[in-house]
């Protein structure tokens, strides 16, 4: 339904060019390496099509953090969230090049444009400085207040979950333990923290 995309865009007051999440349609769930994008898999009448939200994978070993020459790309030691400090970012795109997950970062243009002439979203939403790189922060401002990221709060299908994977009693840890899952591009060695239940 793309509600997560809309919730994210509004909560973060993102400029028109900036999306932290994109929802891909995938024909074959279970192996993203061989997935068919924007095309159903199977044979009629037994076709399969799934919707897969893709954003920063907030890796345990983020290659983007190591590649950033200014230290602007950081990993929060308490939450594990990977984020970019716009005041330190020089817009060199090293993090984009280093990231094995295509399209999860955006280089914001020098003069970003908004859909509306008024600020929408959270009062403490990220500042969108021109000529910097931005990405999903799992709504750091919200999780620091004890709330869930906007994409998870507004998911009408309750298909998205947030929590501490190291806490076995958390909902997300229980779901991962009880279900089959895949993680994107595991061969890159970054240990993504986003799990897709199949």
Regions found by a protein language model. Name each.
Residues 1-198:
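Non-ligating segments of multi-cofactor redox enzymes
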């Amino acid at each position: 339904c793309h509600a997560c995309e809309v919730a994210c865009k509004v909560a973060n007051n993102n400029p028109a060019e900036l999306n932290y999440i994109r929802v891909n349609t995938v024909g074959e769930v279970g192996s993203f390496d061989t997935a068919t994008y924007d095309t159903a898999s199977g044979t009629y009448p037994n076709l399969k099509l799934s919707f897969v939200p893709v954003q920063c994978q907030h890796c345990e070993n983020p290659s983007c953090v190591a590649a950033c020459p200014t230290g602007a790309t950081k990993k929060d030691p308490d939450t594990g969230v990977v984020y970019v400090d716009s005041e330190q970012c020089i817009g060199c795109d090293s993090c984009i090049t280093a990231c094995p997950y295509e399209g999860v970062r955006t280089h914001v243009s020098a003069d970003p444009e908004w859909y509306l002439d008024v600020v929408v979203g959270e009062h403490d939403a990220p500042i969108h400085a021109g000529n910097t790189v931005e990405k999903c922060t799992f709504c750091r401002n919200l999780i620091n207040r004890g709330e869930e990221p906007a994409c998870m709060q507004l998911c009408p299908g309750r298909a998205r979950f947030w929590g501490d994977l190291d806490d076995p009693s958390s909902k997300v840890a229980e779901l991962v333990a009880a279900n089959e899952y895949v993680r994107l591009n595991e061969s890159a060695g970054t240990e993504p923290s986003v799990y897709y239940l199949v």
